[in-house]
């Protein structure tokens, strides 16, 4: 356990945790994970009681208490099969639209999760329109064609309606997962020019309103490094602020601090972290500090949700279309049925268990955290901190120390200085009631 005790004043040499005087304007709306086709496939193979126990651990209040889920519109790279909801060439009237293939195991598993967590926030992302709406005619790679924008908006509205008929409410939709990459045609993907995305968002917003759907649109859904693209879209198409006013980001390139530039110019836009998960062959079970740092940075820079990647995969990171080597939040061994857990799972044990939906985030920093140049080139990584005030008035500090030595910290709270020692390679939770 970490050491924490009150002290009469500041302690020389201990780093100071600084939290802002005021919380961020928008309250935090929850942590989650992607419920991909592959995850549903794996869930469906589990014995009923094992699955119930696992899902209760992930979504129950005594477990991770996740409250957000990302769904896929048709196939993603983490699906057991490749399909859209209308693979009939040039079916612009969408007469052959059908979600039947989701009914085998995708919808049943999602409904099981919704039954366990009735208030879960579900948003959805398409990896590709039907191939016939794109250059090249394939779901794997290619560009979205402008002439199909209106038809594709109808396609998405149909998807939302079909899911809602079955008791699955889609709170938000992203136009396209990662619109700036085609992944060399290895997986369902589609490149969208920013002009095309902006025009499509306007059309989709119109059709959602006409259909009396309150589903929100979260733009972009790609890397932090693309923040300038989002800024350009809002400047070039001011109507997007009313039609959307939300942007979603992944962590594969860039850093969360880039989002400050968006907030400076458009303080009323909402931000979400929508994808980031463990790698199967890279410290899979022990990378909790990586995720403690990432979650802290995302929350400190205004992300209102934080959603990981696959909920559950097998020991080979499958099934998937690729191949790719992501790990699931948990791993189900296909031979033994044994469950093992990622470092990200253990980090959620801190963040999502203790930071409640509706919490107010106080951006945090740690003063004097830089290493001495005497240590060059073996510098430590900075200790990170996140602070949240929950709806029940409890105040939570999440401290991540990724280094091989303990971190000596101090924090002023409730008219009292507190001395804190964060253990090496640790994520720690401190609660002030």
Task: Kindly give the residue locations of the regions a language model identified.
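Substrate-binding and catalytic surfaces of secreted/luminal carbohydrate-active proteins
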Residues: 1-18, 122-124, 154-162, 166-171, ...
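N-terminal catalytic cores of secreted or lumenal carbohydrate-active enzymes
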Residues: 2-170, 202
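Short, internal active-site loops enriched in acidic
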Residues: 74-78, 128-131, 177-181, 222-226
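Aromatic-lined, polymer-binding surfaces characteristic
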Residues: 129-137, 141, 148-149, 177-197
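Ser/Thr-glycine-rich phosphate-binding loops at phosphate-binding pockets of nucleotides
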Residues: 174
């Amino acid at each position: 356990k970490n050491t924490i005790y009150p002290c009469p004043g500041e302690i020389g040499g201990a780093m100071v945790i600084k939290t802002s005087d005021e919380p961020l304007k928008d309250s935090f709306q929850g942590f989650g994970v992607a419920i991909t086709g592959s995850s549903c496939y794996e869930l469906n193979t589990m014995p009923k009681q094992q699955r119930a126990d696992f899902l209760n651990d992930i979504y129950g209040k005594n477990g991770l208490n996740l409250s957000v889920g990302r769904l896929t519109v048709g196939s993603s790279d983490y699906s057991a099969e490749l399909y859209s909801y209308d693979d009939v060439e040039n079916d612009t009237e969408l007469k052959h639209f059908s979600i039947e293939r989701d009914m085998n195991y995708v919808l049943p598993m999602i409904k099981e999760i919704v039954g366990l967590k009735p208030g879960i926030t579900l948003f959805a992302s398409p990896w590709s329109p039907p191939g016939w709406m794109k250059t090249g005619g394939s779901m794997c790679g290619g560009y979205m064609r402008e002439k199909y924008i209106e038809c594709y908006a109808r396609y998405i509205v149909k998807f939302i309606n079909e899911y809602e008929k079955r008791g699955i409410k889609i709170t938000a939709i992203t136009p396209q997962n990662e619109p700036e990459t085609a992944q060399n045609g290895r997986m369902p993907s589609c490149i969208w020019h920013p002009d095309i995305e902006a025009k499509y968002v306007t059309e989709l917003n119109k059709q959602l309103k006409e259909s009396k759907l309150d589903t929100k649109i979260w733009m972009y859904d790609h890397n932090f490094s693309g923040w300038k693209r989002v800024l350009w879209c809002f400047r070039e198409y001011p109507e997007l602020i009313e039609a959307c006013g939300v942007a979603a980001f992944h962590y594969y390139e860039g850093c969360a601090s880039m989002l400050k530039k968006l907030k400076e110019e458009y303080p009323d836009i909402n931000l979400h972290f929508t994808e980031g998960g463990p790698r199967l062959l890279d410290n899979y079970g022990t990378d909790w500090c990586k995720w403690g740092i990432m979650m802290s940075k995302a929350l400190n820079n205004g992300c209102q949700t934080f959603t990981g990647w696959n909920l559950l995969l097998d020991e080979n990171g499958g099934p998937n279309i690729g191949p790719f080597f992501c790990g699931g939040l948990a791993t189900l061994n296909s031979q033994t049925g044994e469950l093992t857990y990622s470092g990200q799972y253990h980090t959620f044990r801190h963040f999502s268990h203790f930071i409640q939906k509706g919490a107010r985030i106080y951006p945090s920093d740690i003063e004097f955290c830089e290493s001495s140049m005497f240590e060059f080139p073996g510098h430590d990584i900075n200790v990170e901190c996140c602070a949240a005030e929950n709806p029940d008035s409890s105040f939570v500090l999440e401290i991540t120390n990724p280094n091989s030595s303990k971190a000596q910290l101090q924090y002023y709270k409730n008219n009292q200085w507190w001395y804190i020692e964060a253990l090496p390679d640790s994520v720690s939770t401190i609660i002030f009631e």
